[in-house]
Curated annotation (Swiss-Prot):
Belongs to the TRAFAC class translation factor GTPase superfamily. Classic translation factor GTPase family. LepA subfamily. It is an enzyme of class 3 (hydrolase). Keywords: Cell inner membrane, Cell membrane, GTP-binding, Hydrolase, Membrane, Nucleotide-binding, Protein biosynthesis. Its EC number is 3.6.5.n1. One of its GO terms (molecular function) is GTP binding. The gene is lepA. This is Elongation factor 4. One of its GO terms (cellular component) is plasma membrane. GTP binds at residues 14-19, 131-134. The keyword Magnesium does not apply. It is found in: Cell inner membrane. It comes from Shewanella frigidimarina (strain NCIMB 400).
Length: 596
């Protein structure tokens, strides 16, 4: 066991995690040069297109070190984006150490900090690596000082490498062996294996990635899942090199996969412990903290007959994405669908895109809302994640909105823009620290504002240099109201939103104007109104299309024309009473894009 090293790679977006992992695989001969593709571990098409890592992936490599021994390296490539931080904490639970990769040109960013603190809290050894030293703008000494100053770990003798050109990658491997401790565990103890990740394979059933903490899991043995108490047979065990490679057993300290033909989707939940069916361990391993969804949105299939396949797709996806939450929902405008809870807007986009791609569904999403805490007049507390579930205002004592603590790292010259943006988003500043050229500011902001478009606006006001990391801290009382859209006096439930009272005029007008552009003209007038309770705050009308009924009168008496016009008027009146307005799908999407 002293020749095993388990580590993960953590870094901010675009600091070169995936490229560095490619190099490590190449140096250790995990794949032949012919099989090497850029970003080997980003296996989803979506990951490659966007250039981001979404799912953590694991690889086991053999490394012949300079001290003459052969070491077994298990490493896990992790996502860098704030929405996927739970993936990072899951990966770190399986490791003894982490490589903190920092771009020698960009320096420390907020996400680097957040992931690094997660690693330090889990008592992992953090090894700093300065990447991209081949760039002309690289300043390794300044960045090393910055790491010491902001993160507080010793970085003066940090390894300097360039994952792109391959310079210094062997030094990184030597550093891993020197600085990261071997795993502790007892091979003779009862089996305890932590499930780090699972996914569903159409042929094999559920495939689980496990880290063996104690004991040995042999091929063909019976094991049980501790949370459900179900027993299964380990049909295949093995490691990823990144290709699947079957083995006869997985020993304590190793990371590998188990395939046992589990067909029910939640048979082996992530964070669970496996043990032997007979003479197993008594206690499960401490799992991960369940992440609570921060943002909810209704998602509906465009054609109602896709509902069943939509449900199956969500079940399969939630196995692979442990943070997804969903429950059935119906809407008078959109039919049957699900209310889905996400970790953030990027997560929401990715989930929708994965559903559309991997399961061939056509979906429509309503405007996202955060969870509000509502105190009723009778003293009970309810949590509302859907605008249509908000009780009438006269029954409510107060509404409390979720507040996040946002840590923003920004170069000095853009500080003014960032502060202006935070004030506009109803934020209050709690802290500001200067680190050389960077400033770390801490703001308390309403989550609803952060969720909408804060990240994009932050990037554009700072030319992409500011970086953001946030977490939920508390609920605060706020003057929130529900804005309804009425079309010819009928509320459209899918367009309702909960917003702050200071924004209603501006938001209501913008929405009404947008709807006016998108709803096609009918044979009768359509009134579009924005209302809060019974008070109408904005209105716009779509004029009726009309046929020129007097065209066939040549000259003649005016009373003849009047008669025809009046007859038309009567018809329009009747039509308006019975006619209903189809709201096109673009209109629902427009609500999401209102701020663009």
């Amino acid at each position: 066991m002293k020749h095993i090293r388990n580590f993960s790679i953590i870094a901010h977006i675009d600091h070169g995690k995936s490229t560095l992992s490619d190099r490590l695989i190449q140096v250790c001969g995990g794949l032949t040069d012919r099989e090497m593709a850029a970003q080997v571990l980003d296996s989803m098409d979506l990951e490659r297109e966007r250039g981001i890592t979404i799912k953590a992936q694991s690889v086991t490599l053999d490394y012949h070190a300079k001290d003459g021994n052969t070491y077994l390296l298990n490493f896990i490539d992790t996502p860098g984006h704030v929405d996927f931080s739970y993936e990072v904490s899951r990966s770190l639970a399986a490791c003894e150490g982490a490589l903190l990769v920092v771009d020698a040109g960009q320096g420390v960013e907020a996400q680097t900090l957040a992931n690094c603190y997660t690693a330090l809290e889990m008592n992992l050894d953090v090894v700093p690596v300065l990447n991209k030293i081949d760039l002309p703008q690289a300043e390794p000494d300044r960045v090393a000082a910055e790491i010491e100053d902001i993160v507080g770990i010793d970085a003066m003798d940090a390894v300097r490498c360039s994952a792109k050109t391959g310079v210094g990658v062997d030094l990184v491997l030597e550093e891993i062996i020197a600085k990261i401790p071997p795993p502790v565990g007892d091979e003779s103890a009862p089996l305890q294996a932590l499930i780090i990740d699972s996914w569903f394979d159409a042929y094999l059933g559920v495939v689980s990635l496990v880290r063996i903490k104690n004991g040995i899991l042999k091929k063909g043995e019976k094991f049980k899942v501790m949370s459900t108490g179900q027993n299964y047979n380990a049909d295949r065990v093995g490691i990823f090199t990144p290709k699947e490679k079957d083995k006869t057993e997985l020993r304590a300290g190793e990371v590998g996969y188990v395939i046992s033909g589990i067909k029910e989707i939640h048979g082996a939940p992530v964070g669970d412990t496996l043990t032997h069916a007979k003479h197993g361990a008594d206690k499960p391993l401490p799992g991960f903290k369940r992440v609570k969804p921060q943002v909810y949105a209704g998602v509906f299939p465009i054609s109602t007959d896709e509902y069943e396949s939509f449900r199956d797709a969500l079940n399969k996806l939630s196995l692979n994405d442990a943070s997804l939450f969903f429950e059935p929902e119906t809407s008078s405008a959109l039919g049957f669908g699900f209310r889905i809870g996400y970790l953030g807007l990027l997560h929401m986009e990715i989930v929708q895109e994965r559903l559309e791609r991997e399961y061939n569904l056509d979906l429509i999403t309503t405007a996202p809302t955060v969870v509000y805490e509502v105190i009723m007049n009778n003293g009970e507390t309810i949590y509302v994640d859907n605008p249509s579930g908000l009780p009438a205002l006269n029954n409510i004592e107060e509404i409390r909105e979720p507040i996040v603590e946002a840590n923003i790292l920004v170069p000095k010259e853009y500080l003014g823009n960032v502060i202006t943006l935070c004030i506009e988003k109803r934020g209050s500043q709690t802290n500001m620290v200067y680190h050389g050229n960077q400033v770390a500011v801490t703001y308390h902001l309403p989550m609803a504002e952060v969720v909408m478009d804060f990240f994009d606006r932050l990037k554009s006001t700072s030319r992409g240099y500011a970086s953001l990391e946030y977490n939920f801290i508390r609920f605060d009382p706020a003057d929130m109201v529900r804005l309804d859209i009425l079309i010819n006096g009928d509320r459209v439930d899918a367009l309702a939103m909960i917003i702050h009272r200071s924004n209603i005029r501006h938001r209501g007008l913008a929405l009404v104007e947008k709807m006016k552009e998108l709803i096609p003209r009918q044979m009768f007038d359509i009134a579009i109104q924005a209302a809060v309770g019974s008070q109408i705050i904005a209105r716009s009308s779509i004029k009726a299309l009309r046929k020129d009924v007097t065209a066939k009168c040549y000259g003649g008496d005016v009373s003849r024309k009047k008669k025809l016009l009046n007859k038309q008027k009567e018809g329009k009146k009747r039509m308006k009473q019975v006619g209903n307005v189809e709201v096109p799908q673009e209109a629902f999407l427009a609500v999401l894009k209102l701020n663009d």
